[in-house]
Design a protein with these regions (language model features):
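N-terminal intrinsically disordered/low-complexity leader segments
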Residues: 1-9, 195-196
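Hydrophobic/aromatic residues within well-ordered alpha-helical segments
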Residues: 10, 53, 60, 64, ...
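Helix-turn-helix
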Residues: 10-13, 17-59
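Solvent-exposed, amphipathic alpha-helical segments
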Residues: 13, 17-24, 70-71, 105, ...
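Hydrophobic alpha-helical connector segments
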Residues: 59-62, 70-103, 150-157
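C-terminal peripheral helix-coil segments that are non-catalytic and often amphipathic
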Residues: 131-136, 140, 160, 167-196
Length: 196
């Protein structure tokens, strides 16, 4: 009897190969052929899971969001609102080699979004989810905050997180990133101490 291949495991292996191609050669090098070669499978085998380049890129972006979501959900909630928010936000920026590689790929996929509707939808969804997350974290710190002020500070925090992530991904590998925690903590403390 032929061996059944676990489709989810195969999909993850192929996306990992895609990430490798993007990380080493850039998103312009992505094709079914280059990803199949990186994964050590035939193009036909790859097409059974991902029929098009767009399907491959979209799946990679979705997996990246799933990975970040999993890390955020793993943050213990039994801590102060400030500590919890800090830990959650630090999972959204590249603070180690794995999250740096992931962010580099994320930036490449965002750049490709203008040419791919699937990536554009995912980019917009991720942006909206990040805003909502920032808003929930700030509301947790100050449950009595004025709605308009909360919206304003949520946009600001969203920009800080995006800018911090983009800045960190450009730092040289091995450079200390401890200062990133201070940026996040200072932003959250300023919100905690502010009056409406």
């Amino acid at each position: 009897m032929p061996r059944r291949i676990d489709r989810a495991a195969r999909k993850a292996e192929l996306v990992e190969a895609l990430w490798s191609v993007i990380h080493h050669h850039g998103v312009s090098a992505v094709s079914l052929r280059t990803v199949a070669a990186a994964a050590g499978v035939s193009v036909g085998s790859l097409r059974h899971v991902f029929p098009t380049r767009s399907a491959l890129l979209t799946s990679a972006a979705e997996l990246m969001i799933d990975n970040v979501t999993r890390r955020v959900r793993a943050v213990p909630t039994d801590q102060s609102a400030l500590a919890y928010a800090t830990e959650v936000l630090l999972h959204l920026v590249p603070t180690d080699s794995a999250s740096r590689a992931e962010m580099e790929i994320n930036v490449a996929l965002i750049a490709e979004a203008g040419a791919d509707r699937g990536l554009l939808r995912i980019r917009d969804r991720a942006r909206n989810e990040l805003y909502r997350l920032c808003r929930r974290l700030l509301a947790r710190i100050r449950p009595d905050a004025d709605e308009e002020r909360l919206d304003e500070r949520s946009r600001r925090l969203h920009v800080v997180v995006d800018g911090l992530a983009f800045h960190l991904v450009q730092e040289r590998p091995g450079t200390s990133r401890r200062w990133a925690r201070s940026v996040v903590e200072e932003e959250l403390r300023a919100w905690s101490a502010s009056a409406d």
